[in-house]
């Protein structure tokens, strides 16, 4: 059985479920429950502070975020995914085709989930000074909370741009905030992550695997600086991770997506899920309650023989180097990322047929064929019948070392070091189970910076496609002017860089437009 933080369940009775609107009442009836604990009465020792910190992780693995809607929102805002067929729900299809509205429930769930994370982090940070029995643990828990708050604001600013910033628990409507400029949000992100990196440990024992580490904070700092196009600053954080020697690439690329190989040497931060043995799912969406031990819907949603709501896009599939297009070798990562009709699954005991797969076909090198996701879907060990209902506990690898090497390659190229950029790219290609020819190649020359930009775009899609990176890659490269034609066919400049602010936020937060920034993003 897995042993780590998600085995600890805490009923967050007193935590706000988000940024709430308070209402007044004229009655003077005293309804106080003498057994009810407030934050002031609860936080008396480090065990209670740790329980509150665990509640943040519980929200992270809830359906609003990593268990369901987070991966959908990222993937549907990219060009690596396509609709599996008519079974893709309307709210998800709207995002895929660029028809998002302020009432879209997928988008709103992610917004609410991120602010729920922020609220829970603020509870921990605000009440930590009351805890005096174990200062070193207290400070580490505050570091974990700041890491998670920094991550949440990074997600918010990436999707919505200017957003309200809260660094304390909201107790009345007068504390609502207007939208802060993107630079201010990034400053909040960087401040939190720097504080976290200063106190978080490099590793944990098995009982605490899944908690934020120094390496995770450094990786997020690098990401934040990259999105601001500050590649020198980003490079310094990635260099520290590389120099630490804490991480290395797994020999087997597919080990990054299997349940049996979680927390391997490549993993820097994972969102933890639990296989409860009954294929049940917590549809509560907030990670609370008696069923808070959380499985993930990823394998159910993307599995070729389950719901198959999404499939790999033709753009993604045809990005891989292949002998049919003149490459000296077909990239093995294609076979380790997707299932094609005719492939075997269930430990080689079953063969995937077209009629097992509901919905659309793909076009790979001119051939029309049904293809589905292999990453995270667990079909490698499941029979066809078992895969019909598959809510399991496969952890999501939010940060892995290959990303750090590819990030470093981009930073080196952007700061004029083409040779170093190629070195980091080739480290990724030299993984023993991949073993692709080193750059430059005949198909991918490296005579100048823009040649290497093309290599980076290609290699990031091959290595990280379907892992929720591409959305931010597109945002970054679009801002740098690197696209002759935008990867998203619906893209309208001045509108589709950002998602619409949820209508519930506009209706419930009267301060949203009180500053210099309009309450809604342009075009919505």
Where do the protein language model's features map onto the residues?
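An aromatic- and glycine-enriched ligand-binding surface/loop that stacks and positions planar moieties
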Residues: 26-87, 194-195, 211-360, 484
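Long, intrinsically disordered, low-complexity segments
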Residues: 25, 57, 65, 81-88, ...
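Bacterial N-terminal signal peptides
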Residues: 11-21
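Structural register within alpha-helical repeat arrays
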Residues: 142, 149, 214, 221, ...
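Conserved, well-structured interaction surfaces
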Residues: 46, 50-54, 58-64, 87-160, ...
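Flexible, polar/acidic helix-loop-strand segments at domain edges
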Residues: 94-98, 321-401
């Amino acid at each position: 059985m897995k042993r780590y933080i998600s085995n600890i369940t805490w009923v967050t009775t007193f935590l706000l479920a988000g940024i709430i609107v308070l209402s007044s009442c004229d009655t003077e009836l005293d309804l106080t429950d003498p057994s009810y604990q407030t934050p002031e009465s609860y936080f008396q020792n480090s065990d209670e502070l740790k329980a509150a910190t665990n509640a943040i992780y519980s929200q992270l693995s809830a359906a609003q975020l990593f268990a369901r809607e987070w991966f959908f929102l990222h993937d549907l805002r990219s060009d690596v995914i396509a609709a599996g067929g008519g079974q893709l729900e309307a709210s998800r299809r709207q995002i895929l085709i660029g028809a998002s509205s302020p009432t879209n429930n997928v988008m709103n769930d992610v917004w609410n989930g991120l602010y729920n994370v922020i609220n829970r982090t603020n509870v921990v940070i605000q009440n930590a000074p009351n805890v005096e029995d174990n200062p070193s643990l207290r400070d580490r828990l505050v570091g974990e909370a700041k890491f998670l708050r920094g991550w949440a604001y990074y997600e918010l600013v990436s999707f919505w741009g200017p957003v309200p910033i809260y660094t304390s628990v909201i107790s009345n409507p007068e504390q609502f905030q207007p939208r802060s400029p993107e630079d201010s949000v990034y400053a909040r992100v960087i401040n939190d992550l720097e504080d976290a990196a200063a106190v978080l440990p490099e590793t944990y024992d098995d009982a605490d695997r899944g908690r934020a580490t120094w390496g995770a904070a450094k990786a997020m700092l690098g990401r934040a600086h990259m999105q601001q196009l500050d590649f020198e600053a980003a490079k310094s954080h990635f260099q520290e991770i590389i120099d630490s020697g804490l991480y290395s690439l797994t020999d087997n690329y597919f080990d990054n997506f299997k349940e049996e190989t979680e927390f391997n040497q490549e993993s820097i931060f994972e969102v933890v899920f639990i296989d409860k043995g009954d294929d049940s799912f917590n549809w509560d969406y907030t990670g609370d309650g008696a069923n808070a031990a959380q499985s993930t819907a990823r394998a159910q949603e993307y599995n070729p023989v389950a719901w198959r709501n999404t499939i790999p896009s033709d753009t993604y599939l045809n990005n891989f180097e292949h002998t049919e297009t003149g490459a000296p070798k077909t990239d093995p990562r294609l076979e380790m990322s997707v299932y094609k009709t005719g492939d075997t699954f269930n430990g080689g005991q079953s063969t995937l047929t077209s009629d097992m797969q509901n919905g659309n076909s793909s076009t790979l090198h001119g051939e029309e064929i049904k293809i589905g996701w292999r990453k995270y879907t667990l079909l490698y060990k499941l029979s066809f019948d078992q895969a019909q209902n598959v809510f399991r506990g496969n952890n999501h690898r939010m940060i892995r070392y290959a990303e750090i090497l590819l990030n470093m390659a981009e930073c080196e190229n952007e700061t004029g070091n083409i040779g170093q950029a190629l070195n980091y790219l080739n480290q990724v290609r030299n993984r023993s189970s991949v073993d692709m020819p080193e750059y430059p190649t005949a198909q991918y020359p490296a005579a100048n910076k823009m040649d290497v930009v093309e290599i980076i775009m290609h290699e990031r899609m091959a290595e990280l496609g379907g892992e929720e990176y591409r959305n931010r890659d597109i945002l970054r490269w679009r801002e740098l002017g690197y696209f002759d034609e935008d990867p998203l066919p619906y893209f309208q400049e001045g509108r589709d860089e950002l998602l619409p602010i949820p209508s519930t936020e506009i209706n419930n937060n009267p301060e949203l437009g009180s500053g210099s920034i309009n309450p809604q993003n342009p075009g919505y």
